[in-house]
Amino acid sequence: MASKGKKPLRRTTTRRRKRSHFKNPSPPCSINSDVTSTSSTSTSPTSTATPSPVSAESGCCTPEKSRIPEMLTCPPAPKKQKVAQNCALRRRQIAFFAPPDVELFFVFALGQQNNK
């Protein structure tokens, strides 16, 4: 009799997504380019007096000064932070607690206690 174990699962192949987070270069705005090109090549006064309609395919464009500048290079990778030096290892003794001073303190404290 054949074993009734589970069949191994097949992994589906995954497609890589297109890199959509990069900006597509857009052509520069040329809203009035049709008007200036027809008026400069034409010599009749009637064509310059009537402006040609703006084509609907050009749509709206953001002014050049208001656009977000494109990054030409990637910013540098973040640097690893330096490990803080362990202060306990480098701690030096405080000069106030030098052995002669400590002994004098206790002698003075014991003398005050005996006088009471």
Swiss-Prot record:
Composition skew (Basic residues), residue ranges: 1-22
Keyword Cell cycle set for record: yes
InterPro entries per UniProt: SMR
Biased composition (Low complexity): 35-56
The protein's role, per its UniProt record: Probable cyclin-dependent protein kinase (CDK) inhibitor that functions as a repressor of mitosis in the endoreduplication cell cycle.
Example GO biological process: regulation of DNA endoreduplication
Keyword annotations from UniProtKB, A to Z: Cell cycle, Protein kinase inhibitor
Protein name: Cyclin-dependent protein kinase inhibitor SMR9
Any one GO MF annotation of this record: protein kinase inhibitor activity
Signal sequence coordinates: none
Span list, region Disordered: 1-62
Presence of the UniProt keyword Cell cycle in the record: yes
